[in-house]
Amino acid sequence: GYIETPLEDLNSGEEYFWLRAKGDSMTNIGIHPGDFLLIRKQNDVDSGDIAVVSVNGDDATLKRVIKKENALVLQPENPAYEMKILVGKEMEDVHIRGRLMKLEKRF
């Protein structure tokens, strides 16, 4: 299927894609399994942004990215999950795929 996306939600010249949320690691900010996530493709984000990230080539995950001086923190928004702190060479294995721009719920 497809999701109609109003042009005002998009910046021209940038690439976007939709993902369907899996898991419950971001429920405290209202992202639940089955929700649709509009992601703007980009390989870097600001500290505090919610992004699609893969580590060590693993499946992509949606987490809040917090940048520290010598570390990168992947913070879930559910206290049942632990944050992942990456330091040193571990940070080289992190690949940001894009930034969350919009959440759409389907009932």
PLM region spans:
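Acidic/glycine-rich C-terminal interaction modules and beta/coil loop segments
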Residues: 1-107
